[in-house]
Curated annotation (Swiss-Prot):
Annotated source species: Homo sapiens
Disordered, as annotated region: 170-315
Subunit comment: Recruited to dense-core vesicles through specific interaction with RAB27A in endocrine cells. Interacts with RAB3A, RAB3B, RAB3C and RAB3D. Interacts with ZYX.
Residues involved in Zn(2+) 1 binding: C95, C98, C120, C123
Residue spans of biased composition, Basic and acidic residues class: 184-193, 221-240
Protein name as annotated: Rab effector Noc2
Biased composition (Low complexity): 298-315
PANTHER family on file: RAB EFFECTOR NOC2, RABPHILIN, ISOFORM A
Recorded superkingdom: Eukaryota
Binding of Zn(2+) 2, residues: C112, C115, C138, C141
InterPro entries membership: FYVE_2, Noc2_FYVE, Rab_BD, Rabphilin/DOC2/Noc2, Znf_FYVE-rel, Znf_FYVE_PHD, Znf_RING/FYVE/PHD
Length: 315
């Protein structure tokens, strides 16, 4: 008995006691075929580069298959989520999927066993047709059962790891896709001259409606004025610019043209003493020159004589 326990026999193998096992563990030796191997024998057991490459290829192939499986499960989950987002009814008075009205005046309805919602017969699937009492499922619950069956979630009691497919822009089946808003192009700033002309034209249209009578009365005087170099009384803006495209607003006259020309001629005769000389800035607006009388050179005819005083002009 003792020989059997302590291993005195040559051919019998006896399990050593704990003390010997602890000692051999500290010495890094054990009861195996590799116990007395030399360093040379251990070096021969190293893997060659070809063997390492083959092992790495197997591991990489397993990883690729795992990624493909996760993508496959992700497509199933994405399809299920899309069906859940596209529901159109409330599941009570309307079909949960298509939104069709249910009841006496509408389509016949069935009751889903899993989600407890009402659907029409077109959107429902009969799960157990052979039984006396048929079992109905909506398409969403039927798809969910299919996902659990094809992904192995029924075995793991939950969905395994999956990878959702990437949403590419412009997909027709993506209801939440919206194109990015394009930024409006910046408008080129208008020049100061163009804006000034437009503002003047708008004011011109407004003023032309109210001052039509004044424009008509002053049109005869304006035709007699020279085209260039004539300015108004204040001298800040010309009557016509050199380009001829822009005109300053016209000032209306309260007195008739004939009466005004007479007043101006009287004032001119009072200042200069004679009516033959023109003012330094040219002829005044509204003043008409006539040929002098043959007998008296340099003097205006009697018809152009002004009234005695300026009070008659103001009256």
């Amino acid at each position: 008995m003792a020989d059997t326990i302590f291993g005195s026999g040559n051919d019998q193998w006896v399990c050593p006691n704990d003390r010997q096992l602890a000692l051999r563990a500290k010495l890094q030796t054990g009861w195996s075929v590799h116990t007395y191997q030399t360093e040379k024998q251990r070096r021969k057991q190293h893997l060659s580069p070809a063997e390492v490459e083959a092992i790495l290829q197997v591991i990489q192939r397993a990883e690729r298959l795992d990624v493909l499986e996760q993508q496959r499960i992700g497509r199933l989950v994405e399809r299920l989520e899309t069906m859940r987002r596209n529901v159109m009814g409330n599941g009570l008075s309307q079909c949960l999927l298509c939104g069709e009205v249910l009841g006496f005046l509408g389509s016949s309805s069935v009751f889903c066993k899993d989600c407890r919602k009402k659907v029409c017969t077109k959107c429902g699937i009969e799960a157990s047709p052979g039984q006396k009492r048929p079992l109905w499922l909506c398409k969403i619950c039927s798809e969910q059962r299919e996902v659990w069956k094809r992904s192995g979630a029924w075995f793991y009691k939950g969905l395994p790891k999956y990878i959702l497919p990437l949403k590419t822009p412009g997909r027709a089946d993506d209801p939440h896709f919206r194109p990015l808003p394009t930024e409006p192009a910046e408008r080129e700033p208008r020049s100061s001259e163009t804006s000034r002309i437009y503002t003047w034209a708008r004011g011109r249209v407004v003023s032309s409606d109210s001052d039509s009578d004044s424009d008509l009365s002053s049109s005869s005087l304006e035709d007699r004025l020279p085209s260039t170099g004539v300015r108004d009384r204040k001298g800040d803006k010309p009557w016509k610019e050199s380009g001829g495209s822009v005109e300053a607003p016209r000032m209306g006259f309260t007195h008739p043209p004939g009466h005004l020309s007479g007043c101006q001629s009287s004032l001119a005769s009072g200042e200069t003493g004679t009516g033959s000389a023109d003012p330094p800035g040219g002829p005044r607006p509204g003043l008409t020159r006539r040929a002098p009388v043959k007998d008296t050179p340099g003097r205006a005819p009697a018809a152009d004589a002004a009234p005695a005083g300026p009070s008659s002009c103001l009256g």
